[in-house]
Design a protein with these regions (language model features):
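Extended, hydrophobic beta-loop-alpha segments that form or line the acyl/peptidyl-thioester binding
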Residues: 28, 121, 125, 216-217, ...
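Flexible, Gly/Pro-enriched loop and linker segments at secondary-structure and domain junctions
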Residues: 18, 90-96, 124-130, 173-189, ...
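A short, small/polar-residue-rich loop/turn motif at beta-strand boundaries
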Residues: 1-4, 103-119, 138-180, 256, ...
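Short amphipathic alpha-helices and their capping loops
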Residues: 3, 54-88, 111-155, 180-182, ...
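Gly/Ser/Thr-rich phosphate-binding loops and adjoining beta-strand/alpha-helix segments
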Residues: 63, 68-70, 89-111, 178-200, ...
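Active-site-proximal acidic secondary-structure segment that organizes catalysis
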Residues: 38-40, 45, 49, 184-238, ...
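Flexible, non-catalytic linker and terminal segments flanking ANL/adenylate-forming cores
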Residues: 45-78, 381, 419-431, 473, ...
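His-Asp-centered acyl/peptidyl-transfer active-site segments
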Residues: 87-95, 122-123, 180, 194-195, ...
């Protein structure tokens, strides 16, 4: 039993552990703490102490106050550049955050609204230069931001909309170089009837999916109400300076040390057919895509309501059980992509705020799905309580450059990403519209993309679930350097088998 599970089991009985003067204290109902509990606390005292110290450090990091200072790359941005920069930047795909939407306003109004948002967020105007002293951040002026225009008003209305969305996608697929003049670009397409489509493309190094939703909502607010309605967050730079200072201090060292020890204790999973170690590497990445139609998505949501959990947890458990059966391993780690916007003060922060939590998975053969899910839920809650804000490309304790060598191995075999896609406004509109997925088959048609040569680190397995409310786009990635084509086939089959067992047709 992990320490996280031990503490969760105690808390379920009302027994709360804490630290006072670096000594373990507990609060509990009368006679709740048994002699067996006390013996376990004594036997695992060192582990419990480390857990509680790390929990306190993570809590302190979540509450750190913004720190004013010079414009500086965040630790996350430095680690992103170490992953995505270099001569092969932009290959085979540009790593951008596309922000595209249709607006019931003309092109000049949307252009002005986009300009206002760009001026509001320094994080979208930052650029970088590399030198002997490391990576430097510089700020472009809001007045120098140029927004491209394309007039499609000569086309029939539906043709104009389809053309605009296609060209917006092409626009957002162009690489925004890390050391380019601008890492954010924008374009507005004028449509018949006084409408338009706006497209903003930011390099992932300066933005994330959460940033996308904030920006789209603010453009709508400016157009409809004259100004953003959301309470502004502090600047991304002030937030990241405070984070950097904290991680360099003693509590930051506690977090780094805890996760280094955790990582060193993790097993190295192996592929089932040839025993290849499931390590991150450079080479061929295979991608398989499919769509979950609305009727099936509704069943997932109903299952979540029945168990009083989120769809996120159901998908994570399906992925974990499939990985356990496929690898014939009951215990292993997974990285789960997350968001550092965990407080009201951070909820409207634009910038690189995504991170990846490391989660212990226990999925015993033959165990009931709900039992496995509850265990994963407890371990995920533990990971959040002990969060170190790292990116999934590196071992979890590598929160900033210099902690390990650049080629330090990443042996966490799988990454999971569940994204509730779109703003609340967008999801409501899609849900209220006609079901465009009614004719889609289930089980789905799986589309395998041509092999992609990735110069950057790839995870052995990576499952993306993009839930739009009315349908979900799913993308399953394999690093072929350690997951052979037969193993890719067997894992895909196992994933659909577990899904069918969990969410009956």
């Amino acid at each position: 039993m992990t320490i996280g599970m031990l503490i969760a089991a105690l808390e379920s009985r009302g027994i709360i552990l804490s630290l006072a003067d670096d000594e373990i204290r507990y609060r509990s109902p009368k006679d709740a703490l048994t002699e067996a509990d006390k013996a376990q606390l004594r036997a695992r005292r060192a582990e419990i102490l480390d857990h509680l110290r790390t929990r306190n450090a993570a809590k302190a990091l979540r509450g750190v106050a913004p720190l004013a200072g010079p414009l500086t790359p965040s630790v996350g941005q430095e680690m992103w550049r170490a992953f995505a920069g270099g001569a092969q930047e932009g290959h085979p795909v540009a790593l951008n955050i596309p922000m595209v939407d249709r607006f019931r306003h003309d092109a000049s109004s949307v252009t002005a609204a986009i300009s206002q948002v760009i001026a509001r967020y320094d994080a979208l105007r930052v650029r970088f230069e590399a030198g002997e002293g490391g990576l430097r951040a510089l700020l472009n002026s809001a007045g120098s931001f140029a927004i491209e225009q394309e007039d499609l008003r000569h086309l029939a209305p539906q043709d104009a909309i389809e053309t605009a969305f296609r060209r917006a996608q092409e626009f957002c697929a162009q690489v925004n170089l890390i050391e380019g003049e601008w890492l954010t670009r924008a374009k507005v397409f004028a449509l018949p009837g006084g409408e338009s489509i706006g497209a903003i493309s930011s390099a992932h190094m300066i933005a994330d999916a959460g940033s996308r939703n904030i920006v789209i909502d603010e453009i709508h607010d400016i157009l409809e109400y004259g100004a953003p309605r959301a309470v502004p967050a502090s600047s991304y730079n002030d937030y990241s300076l405070a984070e950097r200072e904290f991680l360099a201090g003693p509590q930051g060292q506690q977090l780094i040390g805890h996760w280094r020890s955790w990582y060193q204790a993790q097993p190295t999973l192996r592929a089932p057919s040839d025993g290849a170690p499931l390590l991150w590497g450079n080479g061929i990445r295979m991608v398989r895509n499919f769509t979950i139609p609305g009727r099936v998505l509704d069943k997932v949501h109903s299952r979540a309501e029945e168990w009083k959990v989120t769809p996120f947890l159901i998908y994570l458990t399906i992925f974990s059980v499939a990985l356990a059966r496929w690898s014939k391993s009951e215990h292993f780690p997974i990285r789960v992509l997350g968001d550092k916007r965990t407080s009201l003060e951070l909820s409207n922060m634009v910038g690189l705020m995504f991170c990846a939590d490391a989660v212990d998975i226990a999925a015993p053969a033959g165990a009931d799905f709900e039992r496995v899910m509850r265990g994963i839920q407890a371990e995920y809650d533990t990971a959040l309580a002990l969060r170190i804000p790292t990116l999934h490309f590196w071992a979890p304790h590598c929160v900033r450059p210099g902690i390990e060598a650049p080629d330090h191995p990443n042996k966490i075999p799988a990454v999971f990403n569940y994204y509730s896609m779109g703003t609340a406004r967008e999801r409501a509109e899609k849900k209220a519209g006609p079901d465009a997925t009614a004719a889609l088959p289930w089980p789905p048609d799986v589309v395998t993309l041509p092999p992609q040569q990735w110069p950057r680190r790839s995870s052995p397995l990576f499952l993306h679930v993009m839930d739009k409310g009315n349908e979900a786009f799913v993308s399953l990635h394999f690093y072929q350097g350690c997951v052979s084509p037969p193993d890719q086939d067997s894992f895909t089959a196992q994933l659909f088998q577990v899904f069918a067992e969990t969410v009956p047709a």
